[in-house]
UniProtKB/Swiss-Prot annotation:
Stretches that traverse the bilayer: none
Protein name as it appears in the record: Rab GDP dissociation inhibitor alpha
Signal peptide region: none
Gene Ontology molecular-function annotations: GTPase activator activity; Rab GDP-dissociation inhibitor activity
Record has Phosphoprotein as a keyword: yes
Keywords annotated in UniProt: Cytoplasm, Golgi apparatus, GTPase activation, Phosphoprotein
UniProt keyword Cytoplasm present: yes
GO biological process, any: negative regulation of protein targeting to membrane
Main location: cytoplasm
Residue(s) carrying Phosphoserine: S427
Amino acid sequence: MDEEYDVIVLGTGLTECILSGIMSVNGKKVLHMDRNPYYGGESSSITPLEELYKRFQLLEGPPETMGRGRDWNVDLIPKFLMANGQLVKMLLYTEVTRYLDFKVVEGSFVYKGGKIYKVPSTETEALASNLMGMFEKRRFRKFLVFVANFDENDPKTFEGVDPQNTSMRDVYRKFDLGQDVIDFTGHALALYRTDDYLDQPCLETINRIKLYSESLARYGKSPYLYPLYGLGELPQGFARLSAIYGGTYMLNKPVDDIIMENGKVVGVKSEGEVARCKQLICDPSYVPDRVRKAGQVIRIICILSHPIKNTNDANSCQIIIPQNQVNRKSDIYVCMISYAHNVAAQGKYIAIASTTVETTDPEKEVEPALELLEPIDQKFVAISDLYEPIDDGSESQVFCSCSYDATTHFETTCNDIKDIYKRMAGSAFDFENMKRKQNDVFGEADQ
């Protein structure tokens, strides 16, 4: 332990493990420690099921009807991967795909007027969908064609829209789209949590809708992927990568002190020994004095013995409840996976409802989601504070990650990773020099 390292990483959450992997691949000497005896930090998957009951202080433990405890891997933070998104690119860049198996999530649904509807995944589905009327569909189709053809480097595709200045509200107006379609587009396709985006320049939204449709085009049923055995596999995959490139891992290792000299990090003290470093990466729990609270998220893990109604018996799906439908500022999300992903006992389903907390009664806020899931065998309620670093780490060289937000995908996490990388390395993280030229997370075989 008494050694010099380029980088010390504290905590084995996904953000920390990806950065540790990338730094190791780039030739840095990395020491990675976690005070917990397991990988994943906030983003771990809990197994066996008995462990989840203990974690939530349910002392009676799981009933026999839950099957074998070790058949369960329950994510604490529910998220899916966008098939064409940044995390999949990072998995390919680092070849971590070889340690993981993915399944396509079977469907994406959106809530409207108390019911759920499938988010159309083909033009035929869009034309047959009950989400909108006939004339609305034609206008929506025109809008989608505009988005598909839009190229920020080719003004001929702009159709009078200025990507840097025209607001998204004005683009919707240009295509004469109604409120329901705007809700659906902004929240189920562009995946915004609130409506703040409406008055921002439209380029970001157009690119988000493009990401959705490109991800969808990849595997057909939905734009989302999910790893077998749960999301806890992701940090472990990147940890293996770091180890292959010479990274040193220590779990169950308490951190006594972060040692600073002249306002700059020089090492970490653990169990009486000091490891020295030039830079430090950590999650907020290791540096409470360097973070501020930026809100709260409620996540309710629900165990079910049935698929969710009106999802065509899907064994995995996402449901988005746009904020306007339930008089809120932020959307409510449901991620559902099941025994088909080796995360639950045979015939069991795990549905996790989550949202950004807006009131003093967070459980009441997610009620519209829970109503869709009834009957629920068991609920586990977690309310987490969201933290963000108070500075960019340039002086202290202590780079702290942000807490995982309420979104159901990893794009915001990847933005944080790229941002930390840029601050540490002084240059942008570049996807283009990916080591592996295969372009498919399933390897060569079609799924």
